[in-house]
Amino acid sequence: MLFRSLLSTAVLAVSLCTDNASAAKHGRFGQKARDAMNIAKRSANAVKHSLKIPVEDYQFLNNKTKPYRVESLPDVHFDLGEMYSGLVPIEKGNVSRSLFFVFQPTIGEPVDEITIWLNGGPGCSSLEAFLQENGRFVWQPGTYQPVENPYSWVNLTNVLWVDQPVGTGFSLGVPTATSEEEIAEDFVKFFKNWQQIFGIKNFKIYVTGESYAGRYVPYISAAFLDQNDTEHFNLKGALAYDPCIGQFDYVQEEAPVVPFVQKNNALFNFNASFLAELESIHEQCGYKDFIDQYLVFPASGVQPPKAMNWSDPTCDVYDIVNNAVLDPNPCFNPYEINEMCPILWDVLGFPTEVDYLPAGASIYFDRADVKRAMHAPNITWSECSVESVFVGGDGGPEQEGDYSANPIEHVLPQVIEGTNRVLIGNGDYDMVILTNGTLLSIQNMTWNGKLGFDTAPSTPINIDIPDLMYNEVFIENGYDPQGGQGVMGIQHYERGLMWAETFQSGHMQPQFQPRVSYRHLEWLLGRRDTL
């Protein structure tokens, strides 16, 4: 999950009561949450219900892993299967700096591979994805209780969710990082220690994530390649959804937002005069010329460095849009623009871009019984950290105190060239990282000897996976069984990089379009040649 301030300073001060000291802790990229929170070896189909696996058949249960085993979870009224969670130190013997993990081995035929998932933020817990995106069960906002996830990534592979960097979720330690290189160095140490506990060697490794993890994933993947150690770091591919890979505020948000509104105005409901005002800003601030020149195939050339002038709000068309849309739709969610009122109860306390918990409700992972069951430390858990996980002030390309270069400049090309199996995807209903902004970033990246894609993406993604989540309900109500979704996106592959545009999906693609995300993972793992 990726966060930034979407409201003007005046509106924040009045309606969210955010003081300057709090706002100064985070850059534009990460402030949003804090304002409110103060060809396959095997094939595997999506499944509705899994068979219970006897404990004696658990693949990774041994004397070292036994203390991490999770036997049950509160409010989960079905068998968890093989599951582990807890803390593993970054440096052996120093438990004061430890990362928290959840590990769910595949429920199918055993595979010698690990798929790592990282949420973004920066500072947002990967337990969000575990519980609401791609874990073995999901508890979505507005739903009564957890249910089995027929499109869980655990159907296909062994999945490891990690709260990182230090200061995120249940992880322990005082943040010290000012760069992605430091975070990747910590993760390399943690991951090797984790593998030694679980007796893992010579596994294929895939690194995945979303949002600000568009920075984590390439840097950690590149660090794995740099280890030159296939026993522990045999990187075979990477995936990043709605990722911060290029210049975030100008290229991935501000420049493409007006065309985005024009395309989706049935959801924004802006009148003709306001649309004309937006179009005028789009042209006068140079965004139209920038898109016309650089969002072309093949790439027209290296894009000039761009940065927003935050002292002059005239060209901050993104915030103008986000403020205005709250009038026709007070429950507008930039993570998924088709959401309308009411704001749904969310067991993680973050249903849209605002912190919301009804009276009498509790945050699931902050419950004492849940912490005990998951071997978690007795600290306050929040979906995103209140304090910054970087200590570089408001510097760096995203004003988060993270001074590393944007991934398109070096590490992402390195990972593509080192694996020839990288997927970058964007959801068309995401207004936090916009689809055309991500494409603009790709068109400014040189990999395997060429700049950008030569050809505009156009090949459809046809999803023939049936509806396994809700089919029983529809059948009970007299409807015919629901089949595949049909065309749900656009794919394009060149020189080791797969582009995937997902229709009707917001920022968290495994949550909003789980069948499409399942197909993406099949490709990443080498189970398919195309999407």
Swiss-Prot record:
Keywords: Carboxypeptidase, Glycoprotein, Hydrolase, Protease, Signal, Zymogen. GO terms for biological process: proteolysis. Removes any amino acid from the C-terminus of a long peptide. Digests preferentially peptides containing a positively charged residue in P1' position, as well as arginine, lysine or phenylalanine in P1 position of ester substrate. Also catalyzes peptide synthesis. It comes from Aspergillus niger. Monomer. Residues 26-52 form a propeptide. PANTHER family: CARBOXYPEPTIDASE, SERINE PROTEASE FAMILY S10 SERINE CARBOXYPEPTIDASE. PROSITE patterns: CARBOXYPEPT_SER_HIS, CARBOXYPEPT_SER_SER. Residues 1-25 form the signal peptide. It comes from the Eukaryota. Optimum pH is 4. Unstable above pH 8. Inhibited by DFP, and Hg(Cl)2. The active site is at residues 211, 430, 507. Induction: In the following growth conditions: acidic pH, absence of nitrogen or carbon source. Its EC number is 3.4.16.-. The gene is pepF. GO terms for molecular function: serine-type carboxypeptidase activity. Glycans are attached at residues 20, 63, 94, 155, 228, 271, 309, 378, 436, 444. This is Serine-type carboxypeptidase F. InterPro entries: AB_hydrolase_fold, Peptidase_S10, Ser_caboxypep_his_AS, Ser_caboxypep_ser_AS. Belongs to the peptidase S10 family.
